Amino acid sequence: MRIVTTRRISQVFFFLLFVWFCIVATVGSKFWQLRGWPIEWFFQLDPLVAVGTVLTTHTLYWPLLWALATVVLTLIFGRFFCSWVCPFGSLHHFVGFLGRRSKKLAHKVKLNRYRKAQRVKYYVLVAFLALTAFPSAAATLQVGILDPIAVITRSFNLVLLPIVDSPTSFIFISRRFYEGGWLILVIFLAAVLLNLAIPRFYCRFICPLGALFGIIDRFAIWRIGKKQRECVNCILCERDCEGGCEPAGNIRISECVLCFNCLDSCKHSVIAYQTKTSAAGEVTNPDISRRGFALSLVSGLFGVGAIRLSNRLGSNWYYKVVRPPGSLPEEEFLKRCVKCGQCMRVCPTNVIQPAGFEGGLENLWTPVLNNRIGSSGCQLNCVACGQVCTTSAIRPITLAEKLGVNEFAEAGPIKMGTAFVDRSRCLPWAMDKPCIVCEENCPLSPKAIFTREEFVTLRDGVFTAKKIGGDTIEILEGSLKPAKFAGGDYYCAVDGSARWKITANTETSLTVSADERFRKLAAEISKIEVQVRLQRPYVDIERCIGCGICEHECPVSGKKAIRVSAEGETRSADRKLLLER
């Protein structure tokens, strides 16, 4: 079997495996739904994620030790990951092939020549690593913005799968929505479609993981090269070169992605995969200048300060950034989150959303709770998000820890935030309309939302009694809307104290649930008041955990009348609402 055929089989296998892992990241009872599938495996193989988290946290989440195997294999075989394993690289490879397949040899060679701009990816890598390492107290993990595994995972989970599945609902029970999905889609399409202009555009010019492999690759034992200097210069080896490494001359080892197209194309067996250096010479070091390195390093160092200028980790923290249950304290969270979207994908209620720029640049695409989207708020019996987090930015917690029961009873439940009633928009508070939706839907026991009963006289609710017969009161002002007061929350009051529930009404009369007292007072009644019984909601901040179900169910559209913010979250000691005694 030809080596390129083997490589294509590997690419198809790992790409389909990646898609399968995206599909099975679904909570459910079917055999393919989150049943021990290693859906974080591609991230665990990613040395850039491992290096980034080590630099920011000075610890290594043990599943990321898989990345060490990737590094060792790269030191032995070269940049195998880019052309044999990486699903994003395989996608670029395929689209690039479609873009150049009908072109002539000279044009293909021109497309695949090395360009000095390919050094940009090394500068991107240096800038990202500078963000993670200097200074350690302010370090932030931003490699997930451009890391290829993070980019393709985020794009598939938050954009492509929801779009493809929307007509059939095979994967998702209900249609999925993600805020800012358009930006993720635009970046993904731009990265993929640029391959039509230059093959593997993203891999050559942008990919920081490819840059890291390029640095490691210069020490590889096995490498592509010429067995002899003499060559007929047919340049067939550069026709389909995926990395632009110029195998016909002094091959650029750091740019070779080990696609083996050159070896397969060489009709004279001059190109070989060997342990000795190329007979025609090699360029082993990445093509970067000291000035460019220094500039990217300084950019990364200044970037740390620039993204923290708004003091979002201090007193100016953004109250709408409500993290999923089990999230680490904000500073530590931002040192670990790679913005992959796995937690958003697995959330059964679709409440976990990618953050925008409102919480600061480093908050972009990190998980936040948006209780207006999806089918509900954060369900009490769900801890799926922490089980799929690659770097443990969201800790894997148990239901007992989330609910604060059994061995966690003393610590209490995990609070994601606190619900606040906006009395200027709440129906019972602002508009004298009966509503207890938030209290009814609070899932806690005892409930964190309770009500206090009040009777309020309606505007224009004072009427003159014209005639009283049995349980019916005819009024002098005949202007009532039929059945308006028949819902069970309206009462007929006399002297502000005696009340009888209104059971029906016409334009000119009210029917009440009369009792003996009503019949005794009937002859004396001249003025009546129509009152509404209001159950005005209050939040017990010591019980509320910020699940957001009340906010999701609130009937006030637009800006909800009860909203959850991050005050009181248990992960941050400086965001407590009450002093502990």
Describe each PLM feature range.
Residues 1-581:
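Non-ligating segments of multi-cofactor redox enzymes
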